[in-house]
Structure formats: structure tokens, C-alpha cells
A protein has these predicted regions:
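Cell-envelope/extracellular polymer assembly enzymes that use nucleotide-activated donors
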Residues: 1-2
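Active-site beta-to-alpha loop of glycosyltransferases that engages the nucleotide-sugar donor
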Residues: 5-16, 36
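Short, acidic, metal-binding catalytic loop of nucleotide-sugar glycosyltransferases
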Residues: 19-28
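Short, high-confidence coil segments that cap the C-terminus of an alpha-helix
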Residues: 27, 80, 110-114
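Short, hydrophobic beta-strand segments that form beta-sheet elements in well-ordered domains
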Residues: 29-34
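Active-site-proximal specificity loops/subdomain of glycosyltransferases
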Residues: 38-85, 94
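Catalytic-site signature of metal-activated, phosphate-bearing donor transferases
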Residues: 62-67, 96-287
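Active-site neighborhood of glycoside hydrolase catalytic domains
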Residues: 77-78, 85-88, 99-103
Length: 287
């Protein structure tokens, strides 16, 4: 099994990604695509690194990224049975009550050609959660989550079917498996969110990255305000734990006219609507 990501100036998140997936798969089975970082975050990495040429590209950034990753994935199937691609802030965590890790989880799913995790956004509530203590697991310090249908992305595959639409779709049928979570850390820390959202807004304006209808064009003020509205609660300890049984997964994956399947549902409206939950206790030591 090999895991890939693409990173641009991710000094905060890239070390977390390498530490987690390196612990799951071994750093020799990680591939980082460096999208023109200038913050030294990709210097002296312990895993395979490819430095990408800068813009202008032949096509837009999203199509360039997708073509690169799909091409690499097809080649990697010469050496691996499973290829995974995640954004640098996305962490695939099988249920610790049932699995020792990703490898153990996949051993029991050899017949599933494409797997999508159940997506949760990890949210920071600064009213009750202080700054991170690096000596403690991150998830033990960031307990709040919301179900995000759009984050149920088909990221694990055993076949060279091409990913589509920013990796929310793929040219093969797939199902969402609640036994593995995708924990999305974009909103895990207010200070980090401000920095990341400013960086992404600048890239959206200069290189047209990200959809105009996504969070990319929104700056730190708008996204911080939305995050605080999502976690607003008189007492965080009264929030129940997330239970996959409370969400309907049957209508999220839909076939599209061009012969691929994708998850349905914009992320920001889902965050406004879906109830706030706590990450179950058994996940708190995952990373």
C-alpha cells in the first residue's frame, strides 16, 4: 500500500501527514508531490519527494493535479496492491475497536475495489479547547466534529480507475464504509485556519485554484466566523459522541452522466446544518 499527497507550503500539516501515514505504512511507502513550496517544509523529507514545475501549466491547476496523481497512481500499481491519495490535512483512521491500522483494515476488504471513508470535519472550539500541547495526541485536544458528506471521498483504490472532480469522484462504483473515518483537519485550529485560508485565497486569486463556490475564495475572517458558529454551544461536555448510525449514507454516492461516481453535497452548507458531535473516545489516541 502506498499513500500520496500534494503539499504547498504546509509546514504545519505535512509533518503530521508523514508521521501518521509513515507510522501506518512506513515512510518508504509515502510519496509527496511538492507544489512549489518556499517555506522549507519539503526539505530533507524521509520519504519519496517529487518537486513539480511551477505555473503556467497546459491546463488549470485542478486538472493538472488530477492528471499528475492519476498518472502516478497507474504507475504505482506495478508495485502496490492499494493506492491512496489524500490532501495533506486528511487522515484515514479505521475504527480502533476493530482494526490495528490501515493495513489490517484493508486485509479484510480485498474484494472491494474502491473504498470511501466516512468524512468528519474536526473543529476547534477555542472557548473550551486551548492551544495544542505537542506532547499530547492532537485528537485528544480537538474533540468536536461534524459529518461532512462531501468528505466521503473515494480515496482508497485497488484498481487504476481515474479520480475525478477534486478526488470527490472516480470512474468506478464505490460505497462509503463507516468502519474507516476521514478526519479532515482544515478547521482543527483557529490560528492555523487563518493562515491556511489566507494562503489559499491568494492562490485562488493568482492561479484560479479551487472552485469559486468552495471555501478557497473565502478569507480568514469569513471562515473563522463560520467555524465559531459551527461550534457554538453553552457547554461542550453536553455534546453527544458521533455515531455513524445517525447519518444516512445511501444517497451520498451518485452516478454521473460522464461515466463516473461522486459524492454529493456542498461542504459549507452541510457544516451549517449538521449537528455538532464529539469524536468517540476510542479514536482519541489515533494521532
Amino acid at each position: 500500500m502506498v499513500a500520496m499527497t500534494m503539499a504547498s507550503n504546509e509546514a504545519d500539516m505535512l509533518p503530521r501527514w508523514i508521521d501518521y501515514y509513515g507510522g501506518q505504512l512506513g515512510v518508504d511507502n509515502l510519496v509527496v508531490l511538492d507544489d512549489n513550496s518556499v517555506d522549507a517544509s519539503t526539505d530533507d523529507l524521509p520519504c519519496t519527494l517529487y518537486r513539480l514545475p511551477g505555473p503556467p501549466w497546459k491546463v488549470n491547476w485542478e486538472r493538472t493535479r488530477r492528471s499528475l496523481v492519476n498518472g502516478l497512481a497507474r504507475g504505482l500499481f506495478a508495485c502496490y496492491d492499494v493506492v491512496v491519495f489524500t490532501d495533506v490535512d486528511e487522515f484515514l483512521v479505521p475504527d480502533p475497536a476493530r482494526y490495528e491500522g490501515l493495513v489490517h483494515y484493508l486485509e479484510g476488504r480485498r474484494e472491494q475495489k474502491v473504498i470511501a471513508p466516512l468524512g468528519l470535519n474536526v473543529l476547534h472550539n477555542p472557548a473550551v479547547e486551548p492551544s495544542l500541547d505537542p506532547s499530547l495526541p492532537l485528537l485528544a485536544q480537538r474533540r468536536f466534529v461534524k459529518f461532512a458528506p462531501a468528505m466521503c471521498k473515494p480515496l482508497l483504490k485497488r484498481i487504476p480507475a481515474d479520480w475525478m472532480v477534486a478526488f470527490h469522484g472516480i470512474k468506478a462504483p464505490f460505497a462509503i464504509d463507516p468502519d474507516v473515518l476521514l478526519l479532515h483537519l482544515k478547521y482543527y485550529d483557529v490560528t492555523a485556519l487563518r493562515a491556511v485560508s489566507e494562503h489559499r485565497r491568494a492562490m485562488h486569486e493568482t492561479d484560479s485554484r479551487g472552485s469559486p463556490h468552495s471555501a478557497w475564495p473565502l478569507g480568514p475572517e469569513a471562515l473563522t466566523s463560520r467555524l465559531l458558529s459551527w461550534v457554538e454551544t453553552p457547554d461542550g461536555h453536553d455534546i453527544p459522541e458521533f455515531d455513524a448510525a445517525e447519518v444516512d449514507l445511501t444517497e451520498i454516492v451518485r452516478p454521473k452522466a460522464k461515466g463516473f461516481y461522486r459524492t454529493h453535497g456542498p461542504q459549507l452548507p452541510a457544516m451549517d446544518k449538521n449537528p455538532l458531535r464529539r469524536l468517540p473516545e476510542r479514536f482519541l489516541k489515533a494521532f
